[in-house]
């Protein structure tokens, strides 16, 4: 969200510096807003303390818990890659109503949670999930390594949203493998039944690795990967400002 603010204000060169600082837990924009919030904090504390004296029901002041930058925030972040993709793909799965949907590596606290509201979903992820959630069946596995024949043509619907770009990068404890994304995509294809639906997202642009965050894929390369395996029903993307462009004609610019 804060990177999008820098984008929209024409300060994109600062994003690299901002990312570097946040790696070490330093958030300059949040720090600036927190400093701006100090006068409001003091003023409101004094006002509330005065009003407490005449209140019928008392709430005693306990530990101080300053939230100095919240007054400068919106009511949630209603844009960005994850926000739009999670809602878009959840809507499509609701409309298609598959018999068995499997998700691989997407956010449990976003997209998977959306699905769990209205249907059961099986989740495969190299990361652990330590709690039980209604409608979610979790299996910890490395999708680069799976050779389990029981999973071949296992489901009629599968998703992997902003996950494959990480395969083999080592970021989440997976073994480093330069071709990890290919192994993952091949296994996803094997898990899906013939004529099944595959919902997929990765970063797109000039092809590169931004280590150790992710890979970025060119459209031409993705189309080459998929041409003999899938028919593309629809293509949507989220731009650098976090806005969704839905059902767009594909162009191989990169």
How does the language model describe each region?
Residues 5-100, 111, 211-229, 233-254:
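N-terminal accessory regions of S-adenosyl-L-methionine
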Residues 72-78, 166-180, 208-209:
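Surface-exposed cleft-lining segments at the edges of enzyme active sites
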Residues 100-146:
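Class I SAM-dependent methyltransferase SAM/SAH-binding core
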Residues 116, 193, 227:
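Short conserved AdoMet
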Residues 147-158:
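A short acidic, Gly/Pro-enriched loop at the edge of an enzyme's catalytic core
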Residues 159-164:
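A conserved beta-strand element that flanks and buttresses the S-adenosyl-L-methionine
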Residues 176-194:
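A short glycine-rich, Lys/Arg-flanked "PGG" loop and its adjoining helix->strand segment in the class I
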Residues 195-203:
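Conserved beta-strand signature within the Rossmann-like core of class I S-adenosyl-L-methionine
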């Amino acid at each position: 969200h804060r990177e999008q603010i820098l984008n929209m204000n024409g300060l994109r060169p600062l994003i690299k510096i901002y990312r570097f600082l946040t790696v070490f837990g330093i958030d300059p924009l949040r720090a600036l807003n927190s400093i701006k919030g100090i006068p409001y904090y003091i003023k409101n504390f004094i006002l509330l303390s005065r009003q407490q004296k005449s209140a019928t029901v008392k709430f005693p002041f306990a530990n101080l818990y300053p939230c100095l930058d919240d007054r400068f925030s919106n009511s949630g972040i209603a844009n960005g890659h994850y926000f739009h993709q999670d809602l878009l793909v959840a809507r499509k799965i609701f409309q298609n109503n598959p018999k068995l949907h499997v998700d691989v590596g997407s956010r449990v606290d976003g997209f998977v949670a959306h699905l769990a509201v209205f249907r059961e979903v099986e989740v495969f992820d190299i990361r652990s999930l330590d709690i039980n959630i209604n409608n979610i069946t979790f299996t910890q596995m490395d999708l680069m390594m799976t050779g389990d024949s029981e999973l071949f043509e296992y489901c009629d619907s599968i998703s992997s949203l902003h996950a494959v770009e990480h395969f083999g990068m080592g970021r989440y404890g997976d073994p480093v493998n330069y071709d990890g994304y290919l192994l993952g995509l091949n296994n996803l294809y094997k898990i899906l039944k013939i004529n099944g639906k595959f919902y997929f997202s990765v970063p797109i642009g000039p092809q590169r690795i931004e280590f150790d965050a992710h890979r970025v894929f060119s459209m031409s390369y993705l189309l080459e990967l998929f041409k003999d395996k899938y028919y593309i029903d629809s293509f949507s993307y989220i731009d650098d400002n976090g806005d969704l462009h839905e059902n767009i004609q594909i162009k191989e610019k990169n």
